[in-house]
Amino acid sequence: MKNRKYIIRVVGILTVGLLLVKMTYQFKYSTFIFDLIFFSGLVIIGLVFLIWSLFSDLKHFRAEKKIISLIPIGIAIVFTTTIWVWNTQINSNFDKPTLVRIFYDGGFNGTGIDFKKDGTYIIDNSAIGLSDFIYGTYEINGNRIILDKKALENVVVTNQLEIRPKIIEYSDRTETDNIVYQIDEEGNVIKNSTEFRLVIDNRE
């Protein structure tokens, strides 16, 4: 019976740990609300296996002095460390200081591009409960932004963007807003391309 429970703990920790590691890696590129709920459930199950292992396997190790008794705990520590490191790296990308942030609101979906001060960017292509992320690098010269990719997710159709003022007329007033346009090599706005609002501008 003791060996059977030990095998259950090892298999359980391996299964839950591998699933959590896989999902943590996938969260760098995509998040879905039901995946987050499933991830939270796996964390709870993993904690149950870990607590069970801490009480049972440490007790057996003290009594038998066999290193094999600590294998489940060791596996759990490896998985926990891996998940923590990857999660820290993912969050560090999002936490970098923003230079410019632009956004397109499509109603039920939207696309935001966060241009970081270190020359990297993150595209967040979102819909209800779902976000897909794309990473890349860029260069900025005045109001022109040059991306490392020619096209991105059927939203950005060029590698050149430009910040330009746009006069917006309302029934009772007229305002000037900064819009980010997609342009070609000659600087012409590409017809029917998505326009972005400039929501954060930390340029000096």
Functional labels for PLM-detected ranges:
Residues 2-117, 122-134, 141, 148-204:
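Lipid interaction determinants
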